Amino acid sequence: MPVSHPTVYEPLTEQGAISLAVRLGLFPEGTPLACREIGDGNLNLVFRVVDQQTKKGIIVKQALPYAKVVGESWPLTLKRAVIESNALRTFASYVPQYVPKVYYSDESLAITVMEDLSHLQIARKGLIEGKTYPLLSQHIGEFIAKTSFYTSDFGMNQQEKKQLAQSFVNPELCKITEDLVFTDPFFNHETNNFEDELRDDVEALWNDDKLHLEAAKLKRKFLTEGDALIHGDLHTGSIFASDEETKIIDPEFAFYGPFGFDIGQFFANLLLNALSRPEQQQEPLFAHIDKTWDVFSTVFSDLWRTHNVEPYAKTEGLLEDVLHHTFIDAIGFAGCEVIRRTIGLAHVADLDGIEDKEERLQAKRYALRLGRSLILQRETLSSTKEIRSLFAQTVLAATN
């Protein structure tokens, strides 16, 4: 895969993106090209370069040296562009059907040129609109299972795994997660962002020593358990989808982390969407949670039995222990994500987009209670069906 020679970093423009596409020969000579900046995230510029005749295009993504959501006062490493392109290539070696093709990367300019997925829709947007994406959980479960297994000590030579893990050391972006997911929402921190009407609920979390202990345990797992190469930010805004197709994007937070983290992030964002819906429209979200875990555990178990390089692989109870801890960790991580997406720095449109103010505030109160329950009760849950029950109990208790 071509990688450029060192150059001096400068932010890309629409004309610059067109010039790059021409230089790389990604379109036939003389093709009339148009370009538009389409990024709506916090950390990058994203350009779509399109053949005006065929409407076929490419995506040019460039990391910014700061977070757009804050500005230049929050500097960020450009190395994350290398992390992202390398993660996409690594994932593609196991599940090419679930990630965009990478055509080119430039380390100095922090640029990745990749497949255009504009025929698909960001899953969060579609779910908010009421779409169900029937294959979403099948695909996400398989993606997490295969990438987790094959990049772990069970799926590859342990020494090779250590070398691969070294290439994905990602301290700056891991710190964002450590702060925004596992720390700041649980304290009176300046990055938090919530409505005044929620202050009593939020201060209750800040003063909850039992919750703090469990959140600290989950943070420690994130800090210390390097099970496999994980996406690191697998929410529904990092997924393109249709009824037939799923593509995972934006793995710039990728690093060697706990098996359960990506699952927990995905669960949390499905639960947040469920909280935004009337009860009679929540079933597809719970079905996706069920299916994700079913597929993950089945595929991971099949790979364990057929491709495991660990001498202890056939030891009775080891697979079950790995899956058990992955599940309860995922539940806890989901709880942290639900809380942070409600009162932390980066919210989700699922809740913030609820038009009626009282309904929006109520949904956020439910989210805080649900997040707390997921964290505190994670070790008592043994199946995804029990997540449904916990969800119902949280909402029911809040209405009584």
Curated annotation (Swiss-Prot):
It is an enzyme of class 2 (transferase). Belongs to the methylthioribose kinase family. The lineage of its organism: Bacteria, Bacillati, Bacillota, Bacilli, Bacillales. Keywords: Amino-acid biosynthesis, ATP-binding, Kinase, Methionine biosynthesis, Nucleotide-binding, Transferase. InterPro entries: Aminoglycoside_PTrfase, Kinase-like_dom_sf, Methylthioribose_kinase. Homodimer. Catalyzes the phosphorylation of methylthioribose into methylthioribose-1-phosphate. One of its GO terms (molecular function) is ATP binding. It holds the Pfam family APH. This is Methylthioribose kinase. Pathway: Amino-acid biosynthesis; L-methionine biosynthesis via salvage pathway; S-methyl-5-thio-alpha-D-ribose 1-phosphate from S-methyl-5'-thioadenosine (hydrolase route): step 2/2. The keyword Lipoprotein does not apply. It comes from Geobacillus sp. (strain WCH70). Substrate binds at D233, R340. GO terms for biological process: L-methionine salvage from methylthioadenosine. ATP binds at N44, K61, E115, D116, L117, D250, P251, E252. The gene is mtnK. It comes from the Bacteria. It catalyses: 5-(methylsulfanyl)-D-ribose + ATP = 5-(methylsulfanyl)-alpha-D-ribose 1-phosphate + ADP + H(+).
